[in-house]
Amino acid sequence: MWLFPERVYYLKNENLLISFYIECYLTITTMFLDDDTPHEESTVQPYSINLVRRLMEGNTKDEGIRVLRMAIKFERIDIIKILLEYGVNVNENEYYEEELTCYSVLHFAVDIGNKDIVSILLYAGADVNNTRCYLRNTPLHLAIQQKNTDIAKLLLDSGADQNITNENGNIPIQIAVTYNDEKMVNILLQYSPNLEIADYNGRTVLHNAVLDKNINIVSLLLENGALVDSKCIEGYTILLSSVNRTDPFIIKMLLHRGANPFFLNIKLNHIPLTWYCYCHGNSLSMTVKDLISSAVMISHIRDKVKLTPGFKINEDFTNSIYRFNYYKNLCEEEIRNMKIRRAGYKLTVFDFIKAGKQDDHNTLARCIELLLVGVNKNEFQIYGDIIDQYIKIGLYRKEQLDRVVNSLTSTITNLPYEVIYIIVEKMTNKELCEIR
């Protein structure tokens, strides 16, 4: 098989190709004349067309892809187009013996960072999901390593599969998280990757983002549905494995998203709270505060008289920590105060929060004003953030309800206001927003 068949030798592009071939000093170290005498590459002159032609004809197996690769290296789009017209196979990988790996021309173009060349190769049929590369990286993996968002979007729009793992078990978005590339993560999330594919350690994208302490990326992943209680190979949940290694604010985010503070790792014989205490002694920090408050709150909402077996197993250990028990008592005291203080409609502050946990937003909306007046935030320092969270939910719900009810009251005059209000309460926030 000839790289350049005889029928195209006389095309006007031949001299351009030959000149380029010599000019770039391709990977050939020696060339041979008729007598098989080696001549150094530097002795070849631009007019030695016959010599170069013989070289190409005598080594046709991989010269086409080599010339194409060199054209990509020098970003010669004119040469690339000519080679593609001649039928050079864009999916033929060039093997590098010293690296024991292959490298497609699409990988190479992505590595160089030339979007136009990448686009040309994709149009010519280059495999966008080619994994014949170092560590079985796809072109998308490389684009993310280069932090090239334009090429990443081009590959995604061309059908790049975000769920292909490399030899380390990393899908492309794992690479973006490792590089703390928030912009790239944002782009990748728009194409709906599977966030639960784990790497070789069994860690999901969220798991690694939490350990990397990147608050913004953690928030993005949570907003896009990443599971908060996935487990790694060792059987640790995200909360358990990161509680003593990440930012305290991230711990709070995980807890607010429903991370289980009671998860017991049998091998460790710890739940997140006791594991944190074990690692940090009796230090009292925001992390301990959030863990205890969430644990106590959940235990009361679920009508649990005592803590879960995870705490019981470590009871002797936890009871020996004075500051831990002191803070635990503060949490429980605030719970008792919440059960006493009324927020209106015969509901206590605790009932209000419990309603929020159950997504009963109508209850929140009905007593929101009295709650705002009646709650003394100085008395609820520990659970202040939780109360504020549901106040925002209640305010938004009430705003939507009032707007729609007032609108309907002006047109429906034969029904009492309260009846209209009850009817409107049956609607979801999305349905309310659609009514103008």
UniProtKB/Swiss-Prot annotation:
Keywords: ANK repeat, Repeat. Pfam families: Ank_2 (PF12796), PRANC (PF09372). ANK repeats lie at residues 63-92, 101-130, 135-164, 168-197, 201-230, 234-266. InterPro entries: Ankyrin_rpt, Ankyrin_rpt-contain_sf, F-box_dom, PRANC_domain. Signal peptide: none annotated. Gene3D superfamilies: Ankyrin repeat-containing domain. Residues 409-436 form the F-box domain. SMART domains: ANK. This is Putative ankyrin repeat protein FPV026.
